[in-house]
Swiss-Prot record:
Protein name per UniProt: Coiled-coil domain-containing protein 34
Region (Disordered): 77-105, 191-228, 310-349
Chain intervals with Low complexity compositional bias: 339-349
InterPro entries according to UniProt: CCDC34 (IPR045323), CCDC34/181 (IPR025259)
Tissue: Expressed in testis and sperm.
Species this protein is from: Mus musculus
Task of the protein: Involved in spermatogenesis. Has a probable role in anterograde intraflagellar transport which is essential for the formation of sperm flagella.
Location (main, coarse): other
Modified residue annotations for Phosphoserine: S55
Subcellular location, record wording: Cell projection, Cilium, Flagellum
Length: 367
């Protein structure tokens, strides 16, 4: 059994085509009923069409649905010799209607809102027609009711599937919309981020340039300050050098004056001594020498004069008490022992002094 689309618009051409065949005494065949069911797009219209075909000719042929009687077109219902009429035509119409139903099923919700009022009024008309013309048998009425229930179930199932498809389509559209919004926001964020990074880089470069300029200015300031300090130090150093040289010159001048004064005093003293030396008596001859193998005395200005006094008591060394035995190590004992050795005798020292005097006198004589 093939069911037509639930929200299919009622086309007046097929309805008039089939209703034109509804004449007095016409018995609809199964194929005729199926075609009429397929062409009709609404259950209310099917009932009206069925009643119009089964009613006397005086009734008007309005748009109705015969889809509820589609099982009557089965082979088990022998309606007469008109079953083979228009089968080829029905096959072609079925293919066209199937392709149209696929396209028109997507527009069901919009058509539902527009045709809801019309369907209700047509249902009322169908009920009135069926009540006025009870041309169906009880079994047919029961079968029509069952088919109506089945059609309602199929319509509900189709509506649910259609709603699911619409929901899926809405979800896909919403997902695409969110995706587009996310892409736009991401692009805006990337642009904002790039702009911010570019701004930060520019600020960083400007800051580095400002720091370089500040360091350069500070360096130049320090160089100028150091130059000024150096000039001040150099000026001060030159002043100190000038003062130092001036003091050295004054000292040198003073030293030269002192030397000149000393020289003059020395020359004066020498002249005085020279004048006094002419009148000074000479000392007695106290030098001795050998002449022809004999010791004789003579005067020599290079010899030392004879001492006028000498100590008749010979020199004696100072008495040193013997050292006490120390309790310390042997190194300290040896030191004390070395320190306690007696000094050389005074006679030897006197002899050495005399010999040195004699040697000095001889050296002067040789000169």
């Amino acid at each position: 059994m093939r069911a037509a689309g639930p929200w299919r618009a009622a086309s007046p051409a097929p309805c008039t085509r089939y209703l034109a065949r509804c004449k007095p005494g016409f018995r609809p065949s199964s194929s005729f009923v199926v075609d009429l069911l397929v062409d009709s797009g609404d259950p209310g219209l099917e009932d009206v069409a069925l009643t119009e075909c089964l009613s006397p000719p005086s009734l008007s042929c309005s748009n109705s649905t015969l889809s509820l009687l589609s099982p009557l077109g089965h082979q088990s219902f022998p309606f007469g010799a008109d079953d083979s009429e228009g089968e080829d035509e029905e096959a072609l119409d079925e293919d066209a209607r199937e392709s149209e139903s696929k396209v028109e099923s997507l527009e069901g919700i919009e058509f539902q809102q527009r045709s809801s009022c019309e369907v209700e009024s047509q249902d009322k008309q169908e009920k009135l027609v069926l009540l006025q013309h009870g041309s169906l048998t009880p079994w047919e009425m029961w079968f029509v009711g069952k088919e109506k229930e089945e059609r309602g179930r199929l319509q509900q199932k189709f509506l649910e599937e259609l709603n699911q498809q619409i929901e899926k389509r809405k979800e896909m559209e919403e997902r695409e919309k969110r995706k587009i919004i996310a892409e736009v926001k991401h692009k805006e964020w990337v642009q904002k981020k790039n702009k911010q990074e570019r701004k930060e880089r520019e600020q960083k470069i400007n800051k580095e340039m400002e720091e370089k300029e500040a360091k350069k200015r500070e360096k130049e300031h320090l160089q100028e300050k150091a130059k000024e300090k150096y000039q001040e130090w150099l000026k001060k150093k030159k002043a100190e050098e000038y003062e130092k040289k001036k003091k050295e010159k004054e000292k040198e001048k003073q030293r030269q004056a002192e030397l000149q004064e000393k020289k003059e005093i020395a020359e004066k003293k020498f002249k005085e001594w020279l004048e006094n030396a002419k009148n000074k008596p000479r000392p007695a001859a106290k030098s001795y020498g050998y002449s022809s193998g004999k010791l004789t005395g003579f005067y020599s200005g290079n010899s030392y004069p004879e001492p006028t006094f000498y100590n008749p008591i010979p020199w004696k060394p100072i008495h040193m008490p013997p050292p006490k035995e120390a309790k310390s190590g042997p190194g300290k004992k040896s030191k004390r022992h070395a320190a306690s050795q007696p000094l050389p005798s005074s006679s030897l020292a006197v002899h050495n002094a005399k010999s040195s005097l004699c040697l000095g006198a001889l050296c002067r004589g040789q000169r």
